[in-house]
Structure formats: structure tokens, C-alpha cells
Amino acid sequence: MNTMTLTPGQLSLSQLYDIWRHPVQLRLDASAIDGINASVACVNDIVAEGRTAYGINTGFGLLAQTRIADEDLQNLQRSLVLSHAAGVGDPLDDAMVRLIMVLKINSLARGFSGIRLSVIEALIALVNAGVYPLIPAKGSVGASGDLAPLAHLSLTLLGEGKARWQGEWLPAQTALKKAGLEPVALAAKEGLALLNGTQASTAFALRGLFEAQELFASAVVCGALTTEAVLGSRRPFDARIHAARGQQGQIDVARLFRHLLTDTSAIAESHHHCHKVQDPYSLRCQPQVMGACLTQLRQTKEVLLAEANAVSDNPLVFADAGEVISGGNFHAEPVAMAADNLALAIAEIGALSERRIALMMDKHMSQLPPFLVKNGGVNSGFMIAQVTAAALASENKALAHPHSVDSLPTSANQEDHVSMAPAAGRRLWEMAANTRGIIAVEWLAACQGIDLREGLTSSPLLEQARQTLREQVAHYTQDRFFAPDIECATALLAQGALQRLVPDFM
């Protein structure tokens, strides 16, 4: 199991990916402790001096004007967690819960939240023991933070609700006991610090980004395979074309195609003197379209990496000045907009792949047998596989609708503009699954097309991509049950079978 020392505010994208993919043993860097303790001392001073400060000794939301007596402060924090745990929907999987928990720890340990080290260490202990709170997928609008999901996370700290331990759903109290842990009692401000933040929204969008990176790389490989299968030209990938435009994403994608295709191949030599002048856009404009998608991926990475390391609590404790200041860092608009932009890229990656599949079906465009199978009529070949790809591409067009332009006021109009970032991030998962299905069909089709080129071969890397598929899925000599082949190719893509052929592009 990977051991990671967490220096608050310094998580890298590769660390976040590892946290999502694998269980982790966390330890907090000692450099964070003084800042954490100073923020707690500031909160304690405010309570001792009888000063009024939002979230410490007041109600919440529209009830912020209500002053809470000192003897009720501990109960206030517990009540806050219980009342806000109002999510619905299927539970998030362990990987997503783990990522949310680490993001929460990373934010709290920055020392602006007034939460004790012992509570942060209790969260770390949950991660290290593999105790995963039951967090329903729905119920947050992404402002004031992800209240419901983070409340469900916090329930387990209190010994309330349910949690998963070693694959079994248990009452949280039981899960804690089996893991050798104890519930905690929250002090002033700690419940609010746990609940306020964009960690669920950010984790949802990060998963979308991680999947989009795999899809992008896989689509570039399959696009290169299709270029070979239909006797496409390498000329559109000439570096001079892309330098003339100056779009960095486009320049970098053209470089990836040159890397995959190399200068020539047996297939390329077979049509070196053909009379075609230009290829269809789905081949010729791959650097332009995929370059625009790459730009979106890179911009999304910058926004989400900043948010993953951000303090999105409210109010914030500035211990050096002895002040607690209310603001709006919990508003997840940056995450929502980033997720919306990422949705466009995921949709377009799939849409372009589907067009290349359609091109291969047309014997006039591909110079291959109709639907990529011999003895057509008796055999239907890839006819309906392309229809499936079209259905998935169409679904993604609807799912790509922006969520950040939507808002519904909540909390009696105190919270009158919200981000809808959780929904913006969560729909990326379905979009990614759809696009992966499309790319799987293209991989199957392109390899079939190259097979039909009478023993001619492509470049070494593309032959490796074909061999990887052929080790699991046989060439189509006649019709057979098609769905298992799509399922197999999809699983290989999800495992990074094609992504590893592409140099780092982020």
C-alpha cells in the first residue's frame, strides 16, 4: 500500500490520481501542526472573550443572526452534522469517498479552519483503516459548499450513520470499533469546518478529468489506426501546418500523431502514389479538434488542481491577526465551469471517433468491404456496432449541456446563487463511459480494417495496439455475438491499454 506524506496545499495531480485508484496510508507533515494549533487557539480566544463570530457561536445560513450560548456550542456542531446529512441516491464507491476524504484533510490542515489536530488525525485514521463513510451521490448544489455529502462523511467521525469496512456496510459505530477507532466529539466551529467546502464537487470533476485523459490518449491511438485502415494521408500532421496556426494543443496533438504513425509504414507505401487530394475532416482535422480538446483538459487540470489544494471553508480563521472573516470560498463555480468545459471535450472526443467509425462503414470512403466484413448480406459486420456508437455520441450531446448556468436559490434566499458543480462533475462519469464505448468500437473496427489490408502492416506502435486487441478479440471472418467484444475492448481501454502508448501530454 502506498504511503504518502501530506504537505497541506501541495498535492500533485499524480498523487490525486493515485489516491483515487488505490488505498493509501496518509501521514501529515509536521510543518502543518503549528498553523492548525494557532487557528484553534484563535477560535478559543473568541469564545473566551464572548465575541460573536459566524459559525463559532451563531446559527447558520439565514439563522446566522442567532447567538448561541457557550454551553450549547458542542451540541450546535453535532446538530449541524446530523441535520445536514440529507443526501439521497446510490452510495459513492470507496475510491470516490477516499478522494473526498483526502481533499477534506488537505484543506483543513492548511490552518485556516479552526479545527483541532485530533479531529484531522481522526479523519486520517479513517483513510488509513479503510473505513469509508456512506455518502449518497446526490444532494449538493455546490454552495454553501458540498454540505450534504460532507455531512454524511462527518457522521462516521461521530459514530453515526453507516460506513463500509472491508467491503461490508456496517453501522458507523461498529465499523469504527472493528477498525480500532473511537468516535470524536466536535468543539466550536468544527462541524461547520467539516461541512463547508468544495471537496465532493472537486473529487467528482477530478474523476472526470482522470477518465478524460485516458479517453483522449485512446482516441488519438484509434484515430491513427483508422487513418491507416482507410489509407489516409500523413500530410495533415506536418508540423509546419500547425506551427502556422500557433494553437499549442493542436501542435502537440499533431506531434502525437507523428509519433504514432512514424514517417511511413507498409500500408502507407501501398498508396503512396494514389490520386486522393484530401481526406475527410474526421481524419484530416484530428489535430485541430483533438487539440482543442487537449486545451480544455489542460485548463481543467489547472482549475481542479488549484481547488484540490484550496481552503474552501467559511468563515476563515486568520490566526496571525486574530480575525475570523466570512466570505464565499465554498462557492464551487470554478469547478462547475471547469466540469462544463471538460464535458465539451469528452463529447467531442467521442463524436469525432464515431465519425471515423462511420467512415469505415462506407466502402466508397474506406476502400474496404462494406461494414468491414466479407460476404456482406449474409454477414452484417460492424453495421449495428456503428449504430451503438452513434447512440452513445447522441446521448453525450444532451449530457454536455452546461450545469454552471443553472441556479436555484436555497436557504430562504440567503444562498441565492449556487454552482450546481456536483451535478456538473458527476455527469462526466456517464459521458466518459459513453465515449469509452465509442472508442472501443473504433478500435475493433480499425483493427479489422487493417487486417483486411492483405497482410500489410502499420507502424510499430500501432501494430502493438492491434496486437493488444487481437490477444483478446479475434478477427471477424463472419458474424458472431458482438457485444462481448465491445465489452472486452472497453475493459482494456479502462485499464490503460492504449494510453500507455502515448507520451505524456498534460
UniProtKB/Swiss-Prot annotation:
Q: Where in the cell is the protein located? A: Cytoplasm
Kindly give the InterPro entries that the UniProt entry links to this protein: Aromatic_Lyase (IPR001106), Fumarase/histidase_N (IPR024083), HutH (IPR005921), L-Aspartase-like (IPR008948), Phe/His_NH3-lyase_AS (IPR022313)
Q: Which reaction does it catalyse?
A: L-histidine = trans-urocanate + NH4(+)
Going by the UniProt record, its keywords in alphabetical order are: Cytoplasm, Histidine metabolism, Lyase
**CDD domains associated with the record:** PAL-HAL
Q: Name one GO biological process term.
A: L-histidine catabolic process to glutamate and formate
Its EC number is 4.3.1.3
PTM entry text = Contains an active site 4-methylidene-imidazol-5-one (MIO), which is formed autocatalytically by cyclization and dehydration of residues Ala-Ser-Gly.
Q: Which HAMAP family match?
A: His_ammonia_lyase
NCBIfam families for the chain: hutH, PRK09367.1
Q: Which family does it belong to?
A: Belongs to the PAL/histidase family.
What name does this protein carry? Histidine ammonia-lyase
The gene name on file is hutH
